[in-house]
């Protein structure tokens, strides 16, 4: 029947804690989480694994979502050892004045997270993560935008 045929074709869930690679003793995974509940659940699952520290590189998705859920994002990153925010991936939306990746930084630091930073320039993201991650750590690239492209770049640089 058609349902069974389609199930056979299903390739599985992509961008849910996908292992991208390991280099220099650092493991890098990629995850699509972009809503506060998904973010918290992904970080909680990562913390249950055997890593020294969990670093989240998060790219906010859509200006409207940032504005709508900004308060809920405050606690979503609580269990991460460090959080690095990129600028917003617009997904075709027009920018909203005053809403940037720094909006997330402010919400999370106001909520009490001691190790959160905003890296506004994409070119600076991989060098920043190289400074933060150490052998035995896990880095999660997270978000619904093009942050997924950073994960293999990070693995390449960690391996040099």
Stretches with model-predicted labels:
Residues 74-135:
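C-terminal helical cap/extension that packs against the catalytic core
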Residues 1-82, 106:
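Nucleotide phosphate-binding/pyrophosphate-handling subdomain across enzymes
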Residues 124-155:
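A glycine-rich beta-strand to alpha-helix segment
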Residues 85, 156-160:
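Short, flexible loop segments at boundaries between secondary-structure elements
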Residues 34, 60-63, 88-93, 144-147:
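Short glycine-rich anion-binding loops that position phosphate/pyrophosphate groups of nucleotides
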Residues 41, 68-70, 96-97, 130, ...:
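Short amphipathic alpha-helical segments
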Residues 57, 119-120, 142:
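Structural motif
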Residues 28-31, 116, 139:
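Generic structural signal for residues in well-ordered beta-strands
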